[in-house]
Amino acid sequence: MGDKIAVIPGTFDPITNGHLDIIERAAKIFDVLYVSVLNNSSKKPLFTIEERMEMIRQVTAHLPNVQVESASGLTVDYAATRGATAIVRGLRAVSDFEYEMQIASMNRTLNADIETFFVMTNTKYSFLSSSMVKEVAQYQGDISELVPEIVNKAVQAKFK
């Protein structure tokens, strides 16, 4: 039947322990997992795409089936170019579900061969977002429990 290939898209600015938890869990299910790093045109990023990709590569180095790439355009189109049959999305709370359901429905309309898989976050990360990490760090708050160590150092360096 071939490899089970999935895409997990996000801006990952920066990658958090919540993101990493979803990536690690998805990597157990899929043979190949593409982490696609996106630019969100409505946000000014703290890190460049290249910096984000490098951090993700470092924190996922223990996952041999994970590949990190940048992507633009529609995620469903990117997934198709990679031979993926699934898009993985993490859900923190019910509030995430409505937005994600709309995107999943649109993706299904655009390409019925690609399924969306929702993965509930570990409850200890249910409050966690990249935006929150940046806000806490901006005011010299401790983010060491929220992000991997190399990300913590990189974020702290941005706010010195």
From Swiss-Prot:
CDD domains: PPAT. Pfam families: CTP_transf_like. It catalyses: (R)-4'-phosphopantetheine + ATP + H(+) = 3'-dephospho-CoA + diphosphate. Substrate binds at T11, K43, T75, R89. ATP binds at T11, F12, H19, G90, L91, R92, E100, Y125, S126, F127, L128, S129, S130, S131. Its cofactor is Mg(2+). It comes from the Bacteria. Belongs to the bacterial CoaD family. This is Phosphopantetheine adenylyltransferase. It comes from Listeria monocytogenes serovar 1/2a (strain ATCC BAA-679 / EGD-e). The gene is coaD.
